[in-house]
Amino acid sequence: MNKLREQTLALASILQTTTLIDQLASTGTCDANSNQASLKSIITSSTKLEEVFNQKQDLLVGIDALKVVLSNKTKCIQHIIFYALALINLEKKLMKNQTLLNQITLEIDLIRNQDFFEISHINSIARLAQLYKSTLGGLNPKIMINGQQIYLSNKHTSNHIRALLLAGIRAVSLWKSQGGKTWHLLLNKKKILNLINTLEGLN
């Protein structure tokens, strides 16, 4: 898999998590298949995109979101872009805090090895949410989620959002491991759009 393809899929994985978060905050539900794939990425240790997201449908939501962003139709997904930029900033802070990084790595290793529940099970989501809250949740500025209060005040939904924020950090890490940088979007916009169209044609 070439570098641009890897970077594009990794960027799509970031936007997928933020899209799912926006769906949860706005409607209380989100795309089930993409949710499973994004949460599972947290406990998949590989840095190869085709191993983390190994089915074509795993990143459909993210690829759709990336296409909208690159088509300059950003007004309708401002929250999604804001969350993505906030996650990139948060991941940068995490990389400078070895104590938090070790804590997160250790807990994820435990979750991966115990494997009591499916990663999308309510208990797994609660555990991932607690991990986010006790580590990344303490860093400033905090990521403020916009949505309907009836959903944001629901414990399971708020846990689910935190779990997906953790998946978003994983996605940013994958993107950076492939050499991803925000200015690449400006330089490679046309190439990325062509690649997305090719990927969509394969589905």
UniProtKB/Swiss-Prot annotation:
Membrane topology, as annotated: Peripheral membrane protein
Example of a GO cellular component annotation carried by this entry: plasma membrane
Membrane spanning stretches: none
Protein's cellular compartments: Cytoplasm; Cell inner membrane
Keyword entries, A-Z: Cell inner membrane, Cell membrane, Cytoplasm, Membrane
Chief localisation class: cytoplasm
Pfam families reported for this sequence: DUF489
Keyword Oxidoreductase: no
UniProt cross-references to PANTHER family, sorted A to Z: HIGH FREQUENCY LYSOGENIZATION PROTEIN HFLD (PTHR38100:SF1)
Similarity remark: Belongs to the HflD family.
Name of the protein: High frequency lysogenization protein HflD homolog
Species name: Vesicomyosocius okutanii subsp. Calyptogena okutanii (strain HA)
Annotated gene: hflD
